[in-house]
């Protein structure tokens, strides 16, 4: 086992604080409408320019192991906030730094760290309660656009694109952000359920110009196994032919004799048909087939349920107004599943999202939820250069997450004003002087956001805080973009409650841990052993007479 270096008490905390400061100082320059960019060197390709706090935090790794521990703890604040709320990473970092700094001073003055922590926890709970009471629910598309604009650093077009996307696919719908090949940013909306499987044979195409198979008022056969034997499919094919309606087959695969016969029938015009592979793999494939069944009002033909393909009747098939199949994707529009069944399935998937601990599983469940709940919108981000596109994509990702958070829990006045106002509303009392000091640490830390935004805008922080607090109105604040004072909500400067709340709770949680640290252990760097010397040369040839 490698030797370790241990630091105690004040020395440990000072080292840790230095690491916290280095990371937080790099991140906090990005805060606010006049926040600056940070350039990150990449081992390949052009440097990355970003104003996204978590992207900056993730790049920081310090040489000193003890300083690095402090930096990594604050990085954890940014990452956790990003995972839960999708935005507010810079806010969380600034708050964590402010609480750690003030807490460190209090510990150095001889106060009990555990009581300070209890005081901090009491104050944070009180502030969260105050914020929840002040939050305003979002109802209009304009309010959604406002939140998006603020998070995208004042880019109105981004706000409008996000508002339009949410209007079209619903609050639960999937909105993805991709890099475009053009200079313009555009929005594309896919209604209905889309999955990434195309037709199994180009002979199924009905529109040769676009290479798409369009089926109207269609029956859908869902089968979880491979279909290779034609005999077992004949009864259901004959039943569908008699209705004169088209049929879509979704199965693990359709191959051999079965596929050949379907293609021949399609070409002869006897049967309007198309076949695609089922989406996903393993258990996820079963779940997605079940989703399609619920959406279209059909049944998945599965041996688990004891249903044989030979005994399938028309009422076991799903129905949809339209199915559109390209080489890569299949879109089912307006399935005829019962609304109550779809709502039940949506509730079930939401419960699974709450329970899962895997980010990957959560992402896949959210995709399934969106496909059932409304549709998919894609924002394609354009720009003149690759660097510009990446920077813009970062901002749109943040704006999208902030907007979702705002729809969930409502909005509060932005620009750090909600927290500044809450600092004057903390009424909770500590059980002793040290807990009271912990409460005061939070009071002072809540001013740090407005101060930092003002500093980044080139204004005097103390004057800004003073002017805002002089006027006792919840929404009255400071607009750093124009250096004016007024009603923040009326000016469209709002923050999602979920983002502000998550940032504060995570910052206080990690900062409390840092304050209560008394010892730090790190591995000593390995001493490189010096390489062996060169072997000696040949000795002199003494004693030999030269002839």
Swiss-Prot record:
This is Chaperonin GroEL 1. GO terms for molecular function: ATP binding; ATP-dependent protein folding chaperone; isomerase activity; unfolded protein binding. One of its GO terms (biological process) is protein refolding. It comes from the Bacteria. It catalyses: ATP + H2O + a folded polypeptide = ADP + phosphate + an unfolded polypeptide. Belongs to the chaperonin (HSP60) family. NCBIfam families: GroEL (TIGR02348), PRK00013.1 (NF000592), PRK12849.1 (NF009487), PRK12850.1 (NF009488), PRK12851.1 (NF009489). HAMAP family: CH60. Its EC number is 5.6.1.7. Its main location: cytoplasm. Together with its co-chaperonin GroES, plays an essential role in assisting protein folding. The GroEL-GroES system forms a nano-cage that allows encapsulation of the non-native substrate proteins and provides a physical environment optimized to promote and accelerate protein folding. InterPro entries: Chaperonin_Cpn60_CS, Cpn60/GroEL, Cpn60/GroEL/TCP-1, GroEL-like_apical_dom_sf, GROEL-like_equatorial_sf, TCP-1-like_intermed_sf. Forms a cylinder of 14 subunits composed of two heptameric rings stacked back-to-back. Interacts with the co-chaperonin GroES. Keywords: ATP-binding, Chaperone, Cytoplasm, Isomerase, Nucleotide-binding. It is found in: Cytoplasm. ATP binds at residues 30-33, 51, 87-91, 415, 495. The lineage of its organism: Bacteria, Pseudomonadati, Pseudomonadota, Alphaproteobacteria, Hyphomicrobiales. GO terms for cellular component: cytoplasm.
């Amino acid at each position: 086992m490698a030797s370790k270096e241990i630091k105690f008490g004040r020395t440990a905390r000072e080292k840790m604080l230095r690491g916290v400061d280095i990371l937080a100082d790099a991140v906090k320059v990005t805060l606010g409408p006049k926040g600056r960019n940070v350039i990150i060197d990449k081992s390949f390709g052009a440097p990355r320019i970003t104003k996204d706090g978590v992207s900056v935090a993730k790049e920081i790794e310090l040489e000193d192991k003890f300083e690095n521990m402090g930096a990594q703890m604050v990085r954890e604040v940014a990452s956790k906030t990003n995972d839960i709320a999708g935005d507010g990473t810079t806010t969380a970092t600034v708050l964590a730094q402010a609480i750690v700094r003030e807490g460190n001073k209090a510990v150095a003055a001889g106060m009990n760290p555990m009581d300070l922590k209890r005081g901090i926890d009491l104050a944070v709970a009180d502030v969260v309660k105050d914020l929840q009471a002040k939050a305003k629910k979002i109802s209009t598309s304009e309010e959604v656009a406002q939140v998006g604009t603020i998070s995208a650093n004042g880019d109105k077009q981004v706000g409008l694109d996000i508002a339009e996307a949410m209007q079209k696919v619903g609050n639960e719908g999937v909105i993805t952000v991709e890099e475009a090949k053009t200079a313009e940013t555009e929005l594309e909306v896919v209604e209905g359920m889309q999955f990434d499987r195309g037709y199994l044979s180009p002979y199924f195409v009905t529109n040769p110009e676009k290479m798409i198979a369009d089926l109207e008022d269609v029956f859908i056969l869902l089968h979880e196994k491979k279909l290779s034997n034609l005999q077992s499919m004949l009864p259901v094919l004959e039943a569908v032919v008699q209705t004169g309606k088209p049929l879509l087959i979704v199965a693990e695969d359709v191959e051999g004799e079965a596929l050949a016969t379907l293609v021949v029938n399609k070409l002869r015009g006897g049967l309007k048909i198309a076949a695609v592979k089922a989406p996903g793999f393993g258990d996820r494939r079963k779940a997605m087939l079940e989703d399609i069944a619920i959406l279209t009002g059909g049944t998945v033909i599965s041996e688990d349920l004891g249903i044989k393909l030979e005994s399938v009747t028309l009422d076991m098939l799903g129905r949809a107004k339209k199915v559109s199949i390209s080489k890569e994707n299949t879109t089912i529009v307006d399935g005829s599943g019962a609304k109550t069944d779809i709502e039940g399935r949506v509730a079930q998937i939401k419960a699974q999202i709450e329970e899962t601990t895997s980010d990957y599983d959560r992402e896949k469940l959210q995709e399934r939820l969106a496909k059932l709940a409304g549709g998919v919108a894609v924002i394609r981000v354009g720009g003149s250069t690759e660097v510009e596109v990446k920077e813009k994509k970062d901002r749109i990702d943040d704006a999208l997450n902030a907007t979702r958070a705002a729809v969930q829990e409502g909005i509060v006045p932005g620009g750090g004003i909600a927290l500044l106002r809450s600092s004057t509303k903390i009424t909770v009392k500590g059980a002793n002087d040290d807990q009271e000091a912990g409460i005061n640490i939070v009071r002072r830390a809540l001013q740090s956001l407005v101060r930092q935004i003002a500093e980044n805008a080139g204004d005097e922080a103390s004057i800004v805080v003073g002017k805002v607090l002089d006027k006792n109105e919840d929404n009255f604040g400071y607009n750093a973009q124009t250096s004016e004072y007024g009603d923040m909500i009326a000016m469209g400067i709002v923050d999602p409650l979920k983002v502000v709340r998550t940032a504060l709770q995570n910052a206080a949680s990690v900062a409390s841990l840092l304050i209560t640290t008394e010892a730090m252990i790190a591995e000593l760097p390995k001493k490189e052993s010096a390489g062996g010397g060169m072997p000696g040369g040949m000795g002199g040839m003494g004693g030999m007479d030269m002839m």
